[in-house]
Amino acid sequence: MRMLNLSRRALLAALAMAAPWPTARAAPRRIVSIGGAITETLYALGAQDELVGVDTTSLYPAAARTLPSVGYARQLSAEGVLSLRPTLVVAGEEAGPPPVLRALEAARVPLVVLDGGHRFEAMVERSVRLAALCGRDAQGQALAQQVKAQWQSVRERVAALSRQAVPPRALFVLSHAAGQMRVAGRETAAHAMLGYAGAVNAFGEGFAGYKPLTPEAVIAVAPQVIVATEQGLEATGGVDGLLKAPGLAQTPAGQTRRVVALEALLLLGFGPRMPQAVATLAEAIFTPLPR
């Protein structure tokens, strides 16, 4: 009987040693997203519950607007970001100013600045990398496959439209409630989107970046369609207000009131909705222009 009790105790001890110790559950991530496309991608990956703060460009989906704001991406406050106790800050290349980013690093907050690039492939790469940062590799691969399939369909549609009509000369106008209107040259998000949609940027050969709109230059390039953001068009008083800008009313686009406007983040954000943006833009600029 004594040996039996000893064996039982030994067996129980052995089982206790073999049983796995309960592990502490990892604390949830607290992500601050600085960039509308980054926020949009986090939602597409299903990581929205880990978001604790966003910047003012994070307008899609609508639920993102209910999150605490850290302000404008280019004018961040270190105190504002740190007050949200983030365990990860993900930002686009436009985030700043640099002293604020250095302050975040000095506070030992993990900061990842994602590469920009106005290409479809760059958007996919950013999405996959963002998924890896959130421990959502499978969701990242699924999202990549989804947008690639959409992109293939869109490219085929744009090619078909380009065969049916002459690619139009398009002018992208960036406007705000205050300040002079600017037009897009090459090496801009607008230039890339116009090209993907099958249009020719009216200032694509003239200069890089954005420059103030001047009547002489606009009349000289004779755009057939004007592209703007919905926010910019509203700020200038709609189509009527936009065409009051010197020179625009004298262009072919102005004379026919050919103005196409898309929501800013959709058009210029280079997020997961990029195929949708290109498809919408292409249909709008090609439909009324038969060969």
Language-model features: locations:
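N-terminal export signals
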Residues: 2-5, 10-26
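Extracytoplasmic substrate-binding proteins
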Residues: 27-30, 99-178, 201-204, 208, ...
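A short, structured surface patch at a secondary-structure boundary
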Residues: 29-100, 202
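Short secondary-structure boundary segments
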Residues: 35, 93-94, 116, 206, ...
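Short helices/loops that flank or line small-molecule/ion binding pockets
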Residues: 79-85, 213-222
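Alpha-to-beta junction loops
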Residues: 85-89, 199, 221-226
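A ligand-binding cleft/hinge motif common to bilobed small-molecule-binding domains
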Residues: 97-106, 225-243
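His/Asp/Glu-enriched short active-site or ligand-binding loop at hydrolase and phosphoryl-transfer sites
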Residues: 184-210, 230
